[in-house]
Every structure is written in structure tokens, then in C-alpha cells.
Amino acid sequence: MAGHSKWANIKHAKARQDAKRGKVFTKLIREITVAARLGGEDIDSNPRLRAVVDKAFAANMPKDTITRAIKRGAGSGAGDNLVEVRYEGYGPSGVAVMVDCLTDNKNRTVAEVRHAFSKCDGNLGTEGSVAYLFKQRGLITFPPNSDEEKIMEIALEVGAEDVTTNDDGSIDVTTLPEDFEKIRNAMKAADLNPSHAEVTVLASTEVGLDKDSAEQMLRLTEMLEDLDDVQNVYSNADYPEEVL
């Protein structure tokens, strides 16, 4: 057993922002457009596009909206002025934070990101200052009372990296990014339906927070995710049970 699930930390940090559906849709449409521009409109041959379309469906975005965003990115050059940039820094209690952005003005974006850090007892770092503390992985989470033995069996058969059973009975299966689709499809083929599945960024080690620091870290996350240019915020914060 290993505490609460990785998705519990990710989900809680995103919960307040996800309530602002209009802003969430705007960010997803931007990401869909860029993914289609860079990799084409065929979801089967564009893993990045497939991943963000899955997120869009999970957020209850209408299919027509998704299709229009894909067509716009693949056909019209929409999103050509957007560049990807990642900022790294430290939050309260030395929590490592990475901020992924899509922007048409890096000077504006870095100023806004720096302001959020400074307002929440943090500071913006240099490139590479915290990236080594994270790794990109597929994360497939199953709810409590799932068939642990069957999940473990399939995971071993198809080459999952790790399987962890959490205190609440949920199960996390982690994969290499390139194996994510194969393993998720194998689970579904075995009638094992995850409550959540995505390629994300996971911390190699976590920093435990007390209640005050956790609230401050959540404030920083909310301020960052409220910025139009910010797509994702990752941290190695381990939130206490009382705020989850």
C-alpha cells in the first residue's frame, strides 16, 4: 500500500480550475489545434492529439467542437503563432513546480508566471532547475474494488512499469509513454475500465506538506492555471489527507 493515489494529488490540484469550464475548453481547444498542426489530424497516428482529445471528451466537450478544432489546426495554419515553453520553479516549502505553456508572447507569459510564484512564497527558477525531479509516464487509475489480481496479471503481460495499490483501494498502473495506448487498450479488452487514464508528468520524489503549505501550494496552482497561456502545472507536492 502506498498512501493516496498519484491521481488524487493531480486531481485535487486541478479541481478548482476545472470548475471554470469555459477556460478549460479554451485551453483544450488551443492544445488540440497545435497538436493537429504539428502531427496531423489522424488521431491513430498522432498520440499527442489522441491524448488531448481524450481529455476533451472527459471534460464533456462537444464532439463538434473537438472536430472543428482539429480541422482548424490541420488545415488553416491556426496556432502557427503559438510556441511551447516550460517554466520551472519552487513553491512553498521547496515544492518543485513545472509550468507548461502555449503562448504567442513569451515576455508576457514569463512575467505572469513569475508574479504568481512571488505571490505564493515561491520563486521562478532557471531551465533545468527542477525538471530532473520529474518523469513523463502513462498513468492508468482503477477505482476501489477493482480486480487487483486481474489488473496485475494484464500489467505484467503487456509490460507496465509499476502497479501500486493505494490506501483507499484504488490502483495505479504506470507505463512508459510509448506503451500507454497498448496497455490501456489491453486493460479495456479485459473488461478492466479505469476511472482515469492519461500520459502525464509524475514526480520521482514528493515533498510532504502541512495544511498551511498545502493551501498555499493550491493557491499557486490555481493562480498559474488561471493564466490563459498556461496549459498544465506539475508539482511534487504530497498533499495531506485533510485537504484531499
From Swiss-Prot:
Subcellular location: Cytoplasm
Main localization category: cytoplasm
Superkingdom: Bacteria
Signal peptide extent: none
Entry keyword set: Cytoplasm, DNA-binding, Transcription, Transcription regulation
SUPFAM superfamilies: YebC-like
Pfam families the record matches: TACO1_YebC_N (PF20772), Transcrip_reg (PF01709)
GO-annotated cellular components: cytosol
UniProt-listed InterPro entries: Integrase-like_N (IPR017856), TACO1_YebC-like_2nd/3rd_dom (IPR048300), TACO1_YebC_N (IPR049083), Transcrip_reg_TACO1-like (IPR002876), Transcrip_reg_TACO1-like_dom3 (IPR026564), YebC-like (IPR029072)
Gene Ontology terms: biological process: regulation of DNA-templated transcription
One example GO MF annotation: DNA binding
Family as reported in the entry's similarity comment: Belongs to the TACO1 family.
Protein name listed in UniProt: Probable transcriptional regulatory protein CBU_1566
Species this chain originates from: Coxiella burnetii (strain RSA 493 / Nine Mile phase I)
